[in-house]
Amino acid sequence: MRLASLAFLSLVLACAPHDPLGSPAPAPVADGEWTAYGKDVFGSRHSGLTQIDTSNVARLQVAWTYHTGELPPQVQTRGRRSLEATPIVVDGTMYLITPLGRVIALDPETGRERWVHDARIDRTIGFGDHTSRGVSTWLDPSRAVGQPCRRRIVAATVDARLLSIDAATGRLGEDFGVRGTVDLRVGLRNRPFETSEYEETSPPVVVNGVIVVGSAVADNQQIDGASGEVRAFDVRTGALRWTWHPVPQDPADPAYATWRGPNAHRTGAANAWSVLAADPARDLVFVPTGSAAPDYYGGERLGDNRYANSITALRASTGKLVWSFQTVHHDVWDYDNASPPALVTVAYGGRRRDAVLQATKTGQLFVLDRETGAPIVPVTEMPVPRSTVPGEE
């Protein structure tokens, strides 16, 4: 087992540009808008607004409060509940999703409710976590102002449904999937036995006409737990466009050899439960994957287990692998790549480079070339002691 490590981190941060990080999107996001979980599909998390600064931040007061009404005793559920949503703001409306799958549109200036779409999550099911980190949006250039679903709100629910909602009315788009919904449990390599073993807790990323979605898979349940495919669906129709397996299934894939014996065909997880990023101009989507099943024992999945615990670039239009960089080999520590990738431009070695930044649970920050996955900042592989657990290596 080996752990990849990073050198010269402080130098990268010192050399990072002070202007907004990330390449400009094809359609720049206005400063007053926040169109994705991380501001934009690049995950830049930068706002150019200047009204609040060091001279007045201490005098800020609450302007309004909105109550979702989902705390006990008003609502009872099985399992934990937490509001983790980052709202998006687009076209003068704020959109968010609650732990129980209620998508809400608010006036961002007053907090007045404009509409609510209730996905009607079964509250008797003990999901691992009742949570959702946000929603995504897409503007259909083929539809005129005032037409239904000109702008869509895309949401993935904890019970693994993909919803396409008219941003103006809160109604499901009837031309998407089955009456506005795609069942994400259909078509999995390892289908979960229980609903709570396969969930959606992060917003999908919408790029170049497709909705790309990962999944949250129950940890430490069984070797052949729910599989962690990353899939893309047509943003208009909901039709499946492609599937990528983070546990490789094709013997011709070079990564297949890093799973010894029959392990690749039965092992689950290695899923991407965090938020994805995208570079529309390069037709790339960046996928941070987690550990394979089970998390803390690798005797049933010997080898480096490549594509698990990786940051992987896929062609957004086809799902084809472009490159993959593994941050931990043969993970037995649950070192998922839990942070969303950030697409930035860094100054290093006397020149500016378009990069992907991936922060990890180990406290390391990997700085990779956006087109090749090669480390921009040198990475040193450090040997660690061999395991003494029976069956491990």
Q: Residue spans of the language-model regions?
A:
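Blade/loop signatures of beta-propeller domains
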Residues: 19-65, 246-253
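Short, polar loop/linker segments at the starts of domains and inter-domain junctions
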Residues: 44-56, 74-83, 257-261
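Short, solvent-exposed loop/turn elements at domain surfaces
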Residues: 35, 41-47, 70-75, 96, ...
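Acidic, proline/glycine-rich low-complexity intrinsically disordered segments
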Residues: 29-34, 41-42, 64, 68-71, ...
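C-terminal motif of bacterial Sec signal peptides marking the signal peptidase cleavage site
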Residues: 13-14
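Repeat-blade elements of multi-bladed beta-propeller folds
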Residues: 34-38, 79-100, 127-161, 196-222, ...
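Extracytoplasmic/lumenal domain signature
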Residues: 55-71, 103-125, 139-146, 162-195, ...
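Sec-dependent signal peptide recognition
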Residues: 1-9
